[in-house]
Regions:
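Single-pass alpha-helical transmembrane signal-anchor segments
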Residues: 6-30
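Hydrophobic alpha-helix/coiled-coil detector that fires on Leu/Ile/Phe-packed helical surfaces
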Residues: 22-34, 50, 137-138, 144-151, ...
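Short beta-strand-turn/beta-hairpin segments enriched in glycine/proline and small hydrophobics
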Residues: 33-51, 91-108, 133, 141, ...
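Short, conserved beta-turn/loop elements at beta-strand boundaries and strand-helix junctions
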Residues: 45-46, 61, 118, 178-184
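Short histidine-centered loop motifs in beta-beta connectors
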Residues: 51, 57-61, 65-66, 115-118, ...
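Surface-exposed strand-loop junctions at beta-sheet edges and helix termini
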Residues: 61-62, 67-68, 99, 108, ...
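Short hydrophobic beta/alpha edge segments that flank linear recognition/processing sites
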Residues: 68-88, 95-100, 124-143, 160, ...
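Beta-strand/loop subdomains of soluble extracytoplasmic proteins
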Residues: 93, 101, 110-113, 151-190
Length: 232
């Protein structure tokens, strides 16, 4: 019996110490850091939209192409659509130069084409998205923070970043900005419920985090990330 006590007591003490240590570590981490895996690599993206409706007569870009602001990416044939319609032909001829200028599809920013939705011969409508260009020279992390924790997050706080594509690698960064509205604030569907029942959902606020990529490791928009923000 005495021998059993000599074995059990040290084991119990060891387990207690482990529990205390784990609890202390958890308390320290929660008091000093905010961590989430609701984050991903992102970049400033702009939709490329036509200023007039027409048929795509030329389209010379593909996903992955680098483009410069103002570069002509394609052209629309707009006259074939209006010549047969009830349009004053004299007015059409007088405004030909203006229409031709609008028929040129130009890159709105410097960047990389990350999506293209059209091919030569298709008809596109005014304001429709023909392609998306991203400024991949300034990649950042977009994290979604719960409204219950958002007031812990402030610009300039240091951040440790892990990208799933690079296991074992930790990137440094800092909080650049906190969005002034929740993700759903500008949803086309109202969050108001008129049926008499309502389920409250925790809202998420987008936070932009810079990432220091000294090794210039390749990163793709949408790659999963885990971030740890120093809140003290």
């Amino acid at each position: 019996m005495e021998k059993a006590k000599k074995i059990i007591i040290p084991v119990v003490i060891a387990l207690l110490l482990i529990g205390i240590g784990a609890g202390g570590y958890f308390f320290y981490e929660s008091a000093n850091y905010y961590k989430t895996d609701n984050a991903s690599v992102s970049a400033h993206m702009v939709n490329i939209v036509p200023m007039v409706s027409g048929t795509v007569s030329s389209w010379g870009i593909e996903e992955g192409d680098k483009v410069n602001q103002g570069q002509i990416l394609g052209n629309l044939d707009v006259f074939s659509m209006v010549s047969s319609s009830k349009v004053d032909q004299t007015a059409l001829e007088n405004s030909a130069n203006s229409i031709l200028a609008k028929a040129e599809i130009k890159a709105p920013i410097n960047g990389e084409i990350v999506q293209t939705n059209v091919i030569k011969g298709v008809t596109v409508a005014l304001g429709s998205t023909m392609a998306v260009v991203a400024d991949t020279s300034d990649m950042f992390i977009k994290a979604n923070i719960e409204e219950t924790n958002i007031f812990k997050i402030k610009p300039e706080q240091k951040v440790s970043i892990k990208i799933d594509a690079y296991p074992g690698k930790t990137f440094a960064g800092y909080v650049e900005s906190v969005a002034p509205a929740t993700q759903n604030a500008f949803s086309q569907f109202s969050s108001l419920n008129t049926s008499g029942t309502y389920s409250k959902v925790t809202q998420m606020i987008p936070v932009r985090i810079s990432i220091i990529n000294d090794e210039s490791l390749p990163m793709l928009i949408g790659m999963n990330a885990t971030i740890k923000i120093s809140i003290k």
